[in-house]
Amino acid sequence: MKLESLCAERGEEAAQACELPLGSGEQPRQLGDLLHADARAQTRFRAQEPPQLPLDPQPLSLEREGVGVTVRQRVLNDGTRRLLRTRGRIEKEPNLGQDSGEAAVHSPLSIRRGAAGDMGRRAYLRGVCGPCLATVTVLLLLVASPARGADVTLVSRLDRALNVPNVDPARTAALAVDLRTGSVVYSRNAALALVPASNQKLPVAYAALAQLGPGYRFHTEIVGSGTLVGDVWHGDLWLRGYGDPTLGPADLAALATDVASWGIRRVDGAVIADESWFDALRVGPGWKPGFYIYESPPLSALAVDRGRYRGRTSANPALAAASLLRQALESAGVAVSERTRTGTLTMIGLPLARDVSQPLADIVRFMGRESDNYTAEMLVKQLGAVYAGHGTTAAGVRVVWDVLAGVGIPLAGVRLADGSGLSSLDRLTATAVVALLEAGLAEGDLRDAFIQSLAVAGVDGTLEDRLGSSPARGQVIAKTGTTSTASALSGFVRDRYAFSILQNGRPISSYWARIAQDRFATALAAAG
């Protein structure tokens, strides 16, 4: 197993460390994920019955006779959304809830995502070997103390690395495991349950990828309740959100254009926003009042640009989204007669337009590397909506718990309250985190996406400005975590070690906590 191949290809040093050629990127992808209505084709739906409203987040299938259909995919690149539009023919109807690799789209455009953007970084596990992946059972047997023959010098160095001022040793947990042998090379308070800060995003990333799949795509749709007479739609247009955390103004503009393509020039009704896929709670449990908006925008199943409206974060993201759609419709030549509002669509409507997000793997990658709280919370609610029937944080963390338990993660002392780690109620142990990291390596279907969600020391994400001049640069990939009472760093050192450091205090010195973490990671990197 070459874990160095999981490092970033951004920067010369990282490319050398990872044994990757500079500028290498993903293979060209064809976009075949979305069928749009095209009024000019003057075709009919093939379905025998009227399209039904979705009972799950999978978009309704709109199979149209005729040739040119518009396909669209949004690409997240360091937080920037970009709309790619092309023309082509769908040879096989794609599964819009999963990666639509089955759908072949013949298009005059060849779209490559790679060297120009972080989201196109190629990072694959090469040469994975069985002994490299220690099982959770072995980890539990060994975690009580370092294995016989452990490098005493390394243990001493790791011990000294953690002993810094203003960080309580009694509230510091650390564990390092040799991936080649499965032996524990260092352990301190590994079973102690501590507040994990943003290390909470690790179980969320794993559960989302395991349950939804790396190719899963969110969708947002416009459904009409009414009839089209001439160029006038008599009725309302419903903007329905299904939890896409990356929905942006450009996507609404494209949706509005698709509505106009039906020949609609006036809506004799209103634009109504439906955010009922999630509950109405805007924050997570156990959050400090100051975290609202400052650390995460208000949570909603329907939010455009994270609820930004007229330069400010709206307390009602869905209503703001409806207003933005109305503006987009007017720009597309569609006038709307009534004022926007929110509501819940309970009747059968006609799907007029649909937007599909980039794959979940890209979204999780951004969430992990940039430690994005909003995305983490949206993923938790999505898990609850899809698998528990309730788009709530409580339902979502229950799904995460069940996923972890299902793969044998030791959950003694673990408590999951939210997705981001902002909650003071969250608890993880170093034992659980290292077991989760090893599970992420062992899962072939999600391994690449899980590993690529980690930041690279001295190269990108939340580790870009850390360990830049140490032996750990480009050798350590990890998830950071910082609040006023907690600090954490968990991840991998090349293909040799998996480690986790959790530190708590009231307050804790983030400065000294990070020094301890960096020394610990550097000692592991120097050990070879």
Label every PLM stretch briefly.
Residues L141-L142, P146-A193, A253-G263:
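Beta-lactamase-like hydrolase cores
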Residues A210-S225, G333-T342, R447-I451:
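Short, well-structured active-site flanking segments
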Residues R171-A173, G230-S300, G307, G333-V334, ...:
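Mid-domain, small-residue-enriched loop/turn segments at the edges of structured enzyme/sensor domains
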Residues V185-S187, G384-G528:
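Small-residue-rich helix-loop
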Residues R308-G444, D448-A449:
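A small/polar active-site loop signature that marks catalytic segments
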Residues G130-V143:
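Bacterial N-terminal signal peptides
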Residues S5, E9-E12, Q16-E19, G23-L34, ...:
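N-terminal targeting segments
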Residues G182, P196-P214, V271, L302, ...:
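Active-site SXXK
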